[in-house]
Amino acid sequence: MRMLLHLSLLALGAAYVYAIPTEIPASALVKETLALLSTHRTLLIANETLRIPVPVHKNHQLCTEEIFQGIGTLESQTVQGGTVERLFKNLSLIKKYIGGQKKKCGEERRRVNQFLDYLQEFLGVMNTEWIIES
């Protein structure tokens, strides 16, 4: 009986350990990265001759490739070391997160009604969250 109790507690402990997420949540990662960016802004703008393309419009979710190309350019021109490395590591993790989310855009054949529901939701987000230029 005692052995059964010990095994049950051991199994419960193992389940608890494996249930704890090993990765930092994306929202916390973004908050930390924003703080690091604010902290290291002066260091990052030290190279005043460097020019990085900036997307013209403000619908950032459409320009992720351009944003990450700019990050790559900035990283290659920045002296590495200390906490600035943490900034670029976080940006790399954010890029991986976005890449993983994009994979969820894969197509799955569904009924027209389900597609129209998705389209309506998409247009609703576009209407409320995107800056639509005239």
From Swiss-Prot:
Keyword set includes Zinc-finger: no
Entry keyword set: Cytokine, Disulfide bond, Glycoprotein, Growth factor, Secreted, Signal
Regions annotated as coiled coil: none
Lineage top rank: taxon: Eukaryota
Signal peptide boundaries: 1-19
Subcellular location: Secreted
GO biological process annotation, one example: immune response
Pfam families the UniProt entry points to: IL5
GO CC, alphabetical: extracellular space
InterPro entries reported in the protein's UniProt record: 4_helix_cytokine-like_core (IPR009079), IL-5 (IPR000186)
GO MF annotations, alphabetized: cytokine activity; growth factor activity; interleukin-5 receptor binding
Sites where a glycan is attached: 22, 47, 90
PANTHER family from the UniProt entry: INTERLEUKIN-5
Binding partners and assembly: Homodimer; disulfide-linked. Interacts with IL5RA. Interacts with CSF2RB.
Function summary: Homodimeric cytokine expressed predominantly by T-lymphocytes and NK cells that plays an important role in the survival, differentiation, and chemotaxis of eosinophils. Also acts on activated and resting B-cells to induce immunoglobulin production, growth, and differentiation. Mechanistically, exerts its biological effects through a receptor composed of IL5RA subunit and the cytokine receptor common subunit beta/CSF2RB.
Family indicated by similarity: Belongs to the IL-5 family.
Name listed for the protein in its UniProt record: Interleukin-5
Organism: Macaca mulatta
Source taxonomy: Eukaryota, Metazoa, Chordata, Craniata, Vertebrata
